[in-house]
């Protein structure tokens, strides 16, 4: 009887240890993609958007002219792609 209690306690302790190890490795795996994505999409001063002479897609075109390939929408005053039926 004592031998069975000891083996059950040892088995239970082994399962708890296995759970802790698996949980720790899984939490490390969850953090890895977050760290990877944050390093990929980190904003660097060298890559900040520069001021343009023309307005790009979905930018206001009241004061600036739209860049090549875009037209100023008469309804919304944004630079948009030209509609195929308006060419």
From Swiss-Prot:
<keyword id="KW-0800">Toxin</keyword>
<keyword id="KW-1015">Disulfide bond</keyword>
<keyword id="KW-0960">Knottin</keyword>
<protein>
    <recommendedName>
        <fullName>U3-theraphotoxin-Hhn1a 14</fullName>
    </recommendedName>
</protein>
<feature type="disulfide bond">
    <location>
        <begin position="66"/>
        <end position="79"/>
    </location>
</feature>
<feature type="disulfide bond">
    <location>
        <begin position="61"/>
        <end position="72"/>
    </location>
</feature>
<keyword id="KW-0964">Secreted</keyword>
<dbReference type="InterPro" id="IPR013140">
    <property type="entry name" value="Huwentoxin_CS1"/>
</dbReference>
<feature type="propeptide">
    <location>
        <begin position="25"/>
        <end position="52"/>
    </location>
</feature>
<keyword id="KW-0872">Ion channel impairing toxin</keyword>
<comment type="function">
    <text>Ion channel inhibitor.</text>
</comment>
<feature type="signal peptide">
    <location>
        <begin position="1"/>
        <end position="24"/>
    </location>
</feature>
<dbReference type="GO" id="GO:0008200">
    <property type="term" value="F:ion channel inhibitor activity"/>
</dbReference>
<feature type="disulfide bond">
    <location>
        <begin position="54"/>
        <end position="67"/>
    </location>
</feature>
<dbReference type="GO" id="GO:0005576">
    <property type="term" value="C:extracellular region"/>
</dbReference>
<comment type="similarity">
    <text>Belongs to the neurotoxin 10 (Hwtx-1) family. 51 (Hntx-8) subfamily. Hntx-8 sub-subfamily.</text>
</comment>
<keyword id="KW-0732">Signal</keyword>
<dbReference type="GO" id="GO:0090729">
    <property type="term" value="F:toxin activity"/>
</dbReference>
<dbReference type="InterPro" id="IPR011696">
    <property type="entry name" value="Huwentoxin-1"/>
</dbReference>
<dbReference type="Pfam" id="PF07740">
    <property type="entry name" value="Toxin_12"/>
</dbReference>
């Amino acid at each position: 009887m004592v031998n069975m209690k000891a083996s059950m306690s040892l088995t239970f302790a082994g399962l708890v240890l296995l759970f802790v190890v698996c949980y720790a490795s899984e939490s490390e795996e969850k953090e890895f993609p977050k760290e990877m994505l944050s390093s990929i999409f980190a904003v660097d001063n060298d890559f900040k958007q520069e001021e343009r002479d023309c307005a790009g897609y979905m930018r206001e075109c009241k004061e600036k002219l739209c860049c090549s390939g875009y037209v100023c929408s008469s309804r919304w005053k944004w630079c948009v792609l030209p509609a195929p039926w308006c060419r």
